[in-house]
Amino acid sequence: MDQLIQVVEAAQERQDLPEIRPGDTIKMQLRVIEGEKERLQAYEGVIISDSGAGTNRTITVRKISNGVGVERIIPLNSPNIESIEVRKYGKTRRAKLSYLRKRTGKAALRVKERKVSAPAGK
């Protein structure tokens, strides 16, 4: 039974997502349905948490909007995610960046930048 679940989940898992970690600054395009209309909404922030695995994987993204911290928990396997673009790769020593919640202003989104080498094929 367990193998059957793994096979079904592997078939359903999204393959078009970039490799992301806590500390990375990302910009997401989310599909929002309002009544009969459908539009894309941009959401940019820092990943402060990553939990689950496979089809159950979720990330918590935090941004500062008009001086107020806003967090969204987003399932990565959601069909409402149009695209994810990594703006900045963050270098952290922790898996959960909950200490960013106490910070205000620019410091609330400041994480050291990680150097990423370009793939050999490009």
Curated annotation (Swiss-Prot):
HAMAP family in the record: Ribosomal_bL19 (MF_00402)
Question: Mind telling me which Pfam families this protein's record contains?
Answer: Ribosomal_L19 (PF01245)
**What is the protein's given name?**
Large ribosomal subunit protein bL19
**Organism of derivation:** Prosthecochloris aestuarii (strain DSM 271 / SK 413)
Show the InterPro entries listed in the entry.
Ribosomal_bL19, Ribosomal_bL19_CS, Ribosomal_bL19_sf, Translation_prot_SH3-like_sf
Q: Which UniProt keywords apply?
A: Ribonucleoprotein, Ribosomal protein
Query: What lineage is on file?
Result: Bacteria, Pseudomonadati, Chlorobiota, Chlorobiia, Chlorobiales
Q: Which residues form a coiled coil?
A: none
One GO BP: translation
The record's function comment reads: This protein is located at the 30S-50S ribosomal subunit interface and may play a role in the structure and function of the aminoacyl-tRNA binding site.
Q: Which family does it belong to?
A: Belongs to the bacterial ribosomal protein bL19 family.
Task: Give this protein's Gene Ontology molecular function annotations.
Answer: structural constituent of ribosome
Gene3D superfamilies, per database record: 2.30.30.790
In terms of PROSITE patterns, this protein maps to: RIBOSOMAL_L19
Q: Which GO terms describe its cellular component?
A: cytosolic large ribosomal subunit
Q: What NCBIfam families does the record point to?
A: rplS_bact
